[in-house]
């Protein structure tokens, strides 16, 4: 077998195995009712960085290996879509409600060839994201900010700002002296 064909075969095999691992993660592992097992799998096989006392509930859906970091005492509730191809960084004491969608990839609509692109999403400490909110690629949610349920965040949010709507716009402010500790884990989620 020529060297080029062998390298091509190895690259294809690696891609197929990577896709199989993601399929197994999203269709089997994320249905296991044990935080310990899921978190261990994510750390070892997906190479995620997961802080202590953080929880990722069942049916969280990931799009890639690596590119995912969550700090201490943070929670991602059930059925969240986490497109980590461009990188997702989540701080400490962050609460992400059910069915939130965080996207890090899109297409350049001004490009004649519909170029795909990735941009990271950064969620700083003490952020709250309400149910079914959508966070788009390239957004930073500043420390202590809050996103209302159903909001679509298209631009970065300053610290301690509350946003709501489609597209999300500022509607208020949170206190700047936040000091709570999130320790939320349900037994079978």
What is the predicted role of each segment?
Residues 158-159, 164-167:
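Acidic, glycine-centered active-site loop in nucleotide-sugar glycosyltransferases
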Residues 51, 140, 158:
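Short conserved AdoMet
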Residues 28, 32, 38-39, 58-70, ...:
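Flexible, glycine/small-residue-enriched loop-and-beta-strand segment within the central core
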Residues 131-155:
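Beta-rich strand-turn-strand
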Residues 185-189:
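Leloir-type glycosyltransferase catalytic cores
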Residues 2-53:
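A transmembrane-helix-recognition feature enriched in membrane-embedded lipid enzymes
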